[in-house]
UniProtKB/Swiss-Prot annotation:
The gene is murA. Belongs to the EPSP synthase family. MurA subfamily. One of its GO terms (biological process) is cell wall organization. Gene3D superfamilies: Enolpyruvate transferase domain. Its EC number is 2.5.1.7. It catalyses: phosphoenolpyruvate + UDP-N-acetyl-alpha-D-glucosamine = UDP-N-acetyl-3-O-(1-carboxyvinyl)-alpha-D-glucosamine + phosphate. The keyword Cell division applies. Cell wall formation. Adds enolpyruvyl to UDP-N-acetylglucosamine. It comes from the Bacteria. Its main location: cytoplasm. This is UDP-N-acetylglucosamine 1-carboxyvinyltransferase. GO terms for cellular component: cytoplasm. The keyword Transferase applies.
Length: 113
């Protein structure tokens, strides 16, 4: 659940450190969070995130299921419209993801191109 925790840490007060002890490449998505304006860096098995008041919209690419979900959550709190590409990753693990978020009040839509 690191991507979702990092999405939250991006806008939380203070500094957060998230550790991944198994799969170091799991932090690849942090570069996409940085595209949204996140103050984050990775160092081996750790990601350090300094919370900021507001993320900004940007096009981002999902590299896997959880990274995609985390990017969608970050995009929901970003200022403006965020496009998350390669959402087929999300579809593999979270059926009806968009519909569930909409039912919770999220301003999100799937755009087919």
């Amino acid at each position: 659940l690191q991507p979702m925790a990092i999405a939250l840490a991006c806008i939380a007060d203070g500094t957060s450190m998230i550790t991944e002890n198994v799969f170091e490449a799991r932090f690849r998505f942090v570069e996409e969070m940085i595209r949204l304006g996140a103050d984050a860096r990775t160092d081996g098995h750790h990601a350090v995130v300094r919370g900021i008041p507001q993320l900004s919209s940007a096009p981002v690419w999902a590299s896997d299921i959880r990274a995609g979900a985390g990017l969608v959550l970050a995009g929901l709190v970003a200022d403006g419209e965020t496009e998350v590409h390669d959402v087929y990753h999300i579809d593999r693990g979270y059926p009806m993801f968009v519909e569930n978020l909409v039912s919770l009040g999220a301003g999100i839509e799937r755009v087919h191109s």
